[in-house]
């Protein structure tokens, strides 16, 4: 029996030793690609309303529905303030994400050392795109706004004034300093795949006489410019560096988009992924749903929600066409809006409709007038004597402007936190309450570009 007991003791000791030995942590997988989706102005109330709107369009009550990115594994709340502003603008918020540094309102990728009106290049911080290109990655930029607008411009440019989209926008100080406008900066940025609006800033409307679209095409045999959806579709999916500008200014809202002239945000995203993935170098792609913000500024909930749903569809397409082991996908907003969901409507009440009680009767305010579930704290459609004539058909129309509490020419941004949704390698860093500047570190660390240690 003794030999057997000795063997058992040895085995037991060996097992205990194995259990107490340190276990090597499995290294976290590095992302080959990162896609940053930014819903401009897509605050949490917008996500909620769009969720219900999309669900109701599919025959549900709506409240139980989920948009594509709401299924992601990781979630955080993001502080959005600018260096000098409690309620931010898109220039400051996009700069925070792209550089990890807060800027003053109205500035793109510059520090407080550059006053408005200067070039902004004396203190331009390093951008994600700079680090990515230095590491051999490709760069893609997609927006339904002008490609020189604040959010897309922050991927490739810097400006002490976000209004420097064209050389005609430069003030006397900027001209004297020899500043370069954002459209010209894009052409020299070495970006690989760029689609959006804003063609007017690249040719005929310029004082310097430059045709920047022709300059893009002249960069190499592989550089191509297109100006409508059919031209884009006729291009080979891979092998080209593409600049596509489909409208003079911003692209159309999704509710009025002509598919023969303008590709959808999903189609633009799909084409970008096909092109960038084929390079096999890895890529950083920023996709902006830029018109959500514009609809909110006009208190037009219908267009804000239809553009948000289109944006969510683009995210779903990206999830379905990328490798989840290699691609980090982030979805966030740059800021929120003073957009509310209120009034105790019954479950399943049309989100664009008048508030109805559980008994089906229309709710009335203290003056005996009906009111909508969706509204704005401020904006152009101040409540007036005509409110008692509102009907469900009127308020559900795509041109209806929601009621606002404070009369302003344009509705404003809001200062509350926005959400950040994440999936893929590196997404575990997205949790809790974070500053917007930390998105820079999430991306660069996932790609192995820098360390925040």
Tell where the protein language model's regions lie, with residue ranges.
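A post-motif C-terminal structural segment
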Residues: 31-33, 42-95, 148-453
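Bacterial N-terminal signal peptides that target proteins for export
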Residues: 1-8
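C-terminal motif of bacterial Sec signal peptides marking the signal peptidase cleavage site
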Residues: 17-18
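Extracytoplasmic mature domains of secreted/periplasmic and thylakoid-lumen proteins
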Residues: 101-183, 190
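Active-site-adjacent structural elements in enzyme catalytic domains
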Residues: 29-36, 41, 45-46, 51, ...
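Structural beta-sheet core signal
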Residues: 36-37, 141, 331
